Amino acid sequence: MMAKWMSVAQVKEKIKESSAEEVTSRYLEVIKKSKINGYLTISDKALEQAKKIDKEGHEGPLAGVPIAIKDNISVVGLPNSCGSKILEGYVPPFNAHVIEKLLSAGAVILGKTNMDEFAMGSSTETSHFGPTANPWDLERVPGGSSGGSAAVVAAGEAPFALGSDTGGSVRCPASFCGVVGLKPTYGAVSRYGVVAYANSLEQVGPLANNVEDIAVLMDVIAGYDRRDSTSIDSKTEYQKALVDDVKGLKIGVPKEFFGEGIHPDVEKAVWDAIHKCESLGATWEEVSMPHIKYALASYYIIAMSEASSNLARFDGTRYGFRAGGENWHAMVSKTRAEGFGTEVKRRILLGTYALSAGYHDKYYLKALKVRTLVKQDFDKALSKVDLLMAPTMPNPAFKIGEKIEDPLTLYLSDINTCPINLAGVPSISVPCGFTDGLPIGLQIMGKPFDEETVLRAAYTFEKNTDYHTKRPPEVA
């Protein structure tokens, strides 16, 4: 009998005992019984991939290990809808760089996961294909925009998954679903083949049930890619960072991340986690990051501005959904009006406004200046300490439908995660407690390309607590 939740090491051991085909088949059976709407597409080639790995005796680091992929990452032969009507039916003819790396390592792609439309959201409610449910409470959101990826990992429907993080889209659902999610340093992982939302902010990131599996996946997908000029070969060896020891580490606690509106149980759980690290030999001190209070506004202006440009390419002319029209202009107008959802249209309009003549300097340029100040806050704080620790999300998962009609309230969900994207530094969310049966995430932030220290601290905390071993009763 195969356990529902297994680490990558356990999956590889199971493959040795049986076969990649049997392991893949077991995951596909679990997915068929799913209650959460985590997958948009199941690969009809998954079993074929697994059989080929068995036959050829593939010796890659992920040989036969199944993985789920967010539906904005291109995979040959699988739809890449980005959770949108406008890309419904689009199947890319090429693989994203991270998919090339995964396939070379022997991974088996189970399917594509649900997401907020074009990664614009924090709840996976803006998907054209309906919301994903949180495995811990099916009436609550899993977070977003990589909600499908986090939810299928939490539900035991994949051992790990890939997401993308533009303003918290890996860490938010990791926190809400009680899994581990890493946003790598900007440039650590190639973005080639990932449908762009906001190029200067987003990174591909892994989600898993433990820190070790995050490191395993990063060792496969990270590195330079000539097709992404922002990518860098940092020479990081992620698995070697997994040392159960935080002695001597200096932790900074930014008071601005514990602002008004934080749930008291979240605040307590995070402070308990910090004190746990202190008991294991780390020290902590409070640090101030005065410009963080402007980060959310800066983030949304920059992200929406970049989105208004990036999404101009979707017009029904070349691929995806096309509406009728008397002429080309009418067709494009109608296609975009019908093909994009409400939230995407809102962000395109606001981004276009921020970039328009007369407002560019007032909004967009000012937001870029604030971004520089936020980056300087991180540089200054991290010059004094090795790490920063804070809540990933100020509150636990909220009810489906609770905030979707109030975009400003929904945007506030990103208040603790978007500053990291503005600064481009690495950040991981690890489970650190519960409130009313809902997971709480601890956010650990580090210096650029110092994922080793971030993973070391996360791994040590995980090894000395048991939060990551808890499983959602809704799907157990």
From Swiss-Prot:
Gene3D superfamilies tied to this protein: Amidase signature (AS) domain
PROSITE patterns from the UniProt entry: AMIDASES
Keyword S-adenosyl-L-methionine: no
Enzymatic reactions: L-glutamyl-tRNA(Gln) + L-glutamine + ATP + H2O = L-glutaminyl-tRNA(Gln) + L-glutamate + ADP + phosphate + H(+)
GO annotations of cellular component type: glutamyl-tRNA(Gln) amidotransferase complex
EC number in record: 6.3.5.7
Top-rank taxon, per record: Archaea
GO molecular function: ATP binding; glutaminyl-tRNA synthase (glutamine-hydrolyzing) activity
Enzyme class: ligase
Keyword vocabulary terms for this entry: ATP-binding, Ligase, Nucleotide-binding, Protein biosynthesis
Catalytic-site annotation from UniProt: 70, 145, 169
GO biological process: translation
HAMAP family, alphabetized: GatA
Similarity comment: Belongs to the amidase family. GatA subfamily.
Subunit structure: Heterotrimer of A, B and C subunits.
NCBIfam families in the cross-refs: gatA (TIGR00132)
Function (record text): Allows the formation of correctly charged Gln-tRNA(Gln) through the transamidation of misacylated Glu-tRNA(Gln) in organisms which lack glutaminyl-tRNA synthetase. The reaction takes place in the presence of glutamine and ATP through an activated gamma-phospho-Glu-tRNA(Gln).
Full protein name: Glutamyl-tRNA(Gln) amidotransferase subunit A
Source organism of this protein record: Methanosarcina mazei (strain ATCC BAA-159 / DSM 3647 / Goe1 / Go1 / JCM 11833 / OCM 88) (Methanosarcina frisia)
